[in-house]
Amino acid sequence: MPTTVRVTKRFTFDMAHALYGYDGPCKNIHGHTYHLSVTVAGVINQQEGHPELGLVVDFGELKEITKKVILLEYDHALVLKNDAPYSKDGFLPDHFEKVLLVPFQPSCENL
């Protein structure tokens, strides 16, 4: 029976957010450096002649998927809750390139 192996690729990106309605300093716009670990579990490819022989996943493909799904959207973005008053007047989205309005409180736990 083949053994399942886990491989992990780590990514680092910077993002700003504000916690609307929070009674503390994090209600203000501030930023963090995030460390994202993407883990893929699978069986090592043992098919002779296959270009991915010996691999669970092609790290180049994993990097591209992570870039498309997460990094292009969140890296150097300002993330705000979509029902916060400052997200409705159009000022932030109109004056900054990467403002992402989300339907949840953009805390580290929710992200």
Please report, for each region that a protein language model flagged, where it lies by residue.
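Charge-rich, low-complexity N-terminal segments
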Residues: 1-111
